[in-house]
UniProtKB/Swiss-Prot annotation:
<dbReference type="InterPro" id="IPR049946">
    <property type="entry name" value="RIBOSOMAL_L20_CS"/>
</dbReference>
<dbReference type="InterPro" id="IPR005813">
    <property type="entry name" value="Ribosomal_bL20"/>
</dbReference>
<dbReference type="GO" id="GO:0000027">
    <property type="term" value="P:ribosomal large subunit assembly"/>
</dbReference>
<keyword id="KW-0699">rRNA-binding</keyword>
<keyword id="KW-0694">RNA-binding</keyword>
<comment type="function">
    <text>Binds directly to 23S ribosomal RNA and is necessary for the in vitro assembly process of the 50S ribosomal subunit. It is not involved in the protein synthesizing functions of that subunit.</text>
</comment>
<protein>
    <recommendedName>
        <fullName>Large ribosomal subunit protein bL20</fullName>
    </recommendedName>
</protein>
<keyword id="KW-0687">Ribonucleoprotein</keyword>
<dbReference type="GO" id="GO:1990904">
    <property type="term" value="C:ribonucleoprotein complex"/>
</dbReference>
<dbReference type="Pfam" id="PF00453">
    <property type="entry name" value="Ribosomal_L20"/>
</dbReference>
<dbReference type="GO" id="GO:0019843">
    <property type="term" value="F:rRNA binding"/>
</dbReference>
<dbReference type="GO" id="GO:0003735">
    <property type="term" value="F:structural constituent of ribosome"/>
</dbReference>
<dbReference type="InterPro" id="IPR035566">
    <property type="entry name" value="Ribosomal_protein_bL20_C"/>
</dbReference>
<comment type="similarity">
    <text>Belongs to the bacterial ribosomal protein bL20 family.</text>
</comment>
<dbReference type="GO" id="GO:0006412">
    <property type="term" value="P:translation"/>
</dbReference>
<dbReference type="GO" id="GO:0005840">
    <property type="term" value="C:ribosome"/>
</dbReference>
<keyword id="KW-0689">Ribosomal protein</keyword>
Length: 121
C-alpha cells in the first residue's frame, strides 16, 4: 500500500486561511496560527453582525422618519399610529426613502396620517 503524505492538503488549507486573513494587521496576516484564530473570530463577528445590521438599518429608518415627520408637525409614534388608522401599509424603509427622495409624496402620506388621526381621535 502506498504511503499517504498530507502536505498538499495542509498547504491548501493554510493557503485558504492566509487568503482569508488578507488585510489583517501584524502577524495575523502571515502566520498560520495567528491567522487561523483571527479568521475564526472574524467569521463569528460576520455571523453576529448579519443580524445586527438589520437592527441598525431599522433604527436608521426610524430616525430619518422621525426627523422628517417632526418638520411636518407630528412625532414618529403619532405618525405610525396615523398610518395604521389610515390603512397605509408602507414599510419604514420605503417611507424613509420617500422622505429623502420625494418629499412631496411623503408630505401627502403625512397628511393622510394626520387626517386619520383627526377622524379617529
Amino acid at each position: 500500500m502506498a504511503r499517504v503524505k498530507r502536505g498538499v492538503t495542509s498547504h491548501a488549507k493554510h493557503k485558504k486561511t492566509l487568503e482569508a486573513a488578507t488585510g489583517f494587521y501584524g502577524r495575523r496576516k502571515n502566520t498560520i496560527r495567528a491567522a487561523k484564530a483571527a479568521v475564526d473570530r472574524s467569521m463569528q463577528y460576520a455571523t453576529r453582525d448579519r443580524r445586527v445590521k438589520k437592527r441598525v438599518f431599522r433604527a436608521l429608518w426610524i430616525q430619518r422618519l422621525n426627523a422628517a415627520v417632526r418638520e411636518l408637525g407630528l412625532t414618529y409614534s403619532r405618525f405610525i399610529d396615523g398610518l395604521a388608522k389610515a390603512g397605509v401599509e408602507i414599510d419604514r424603509k420605503v417611507l424613509s426613502e420617500l422622505a429623502i427622495s420625494q418629499p412631496e409624496a411623503f408630505k401627502a402620506i403625512v397628511e393622510q396620517a394626520k387626517s386619520a388621526l383627526a377622524t379617529a381621535g
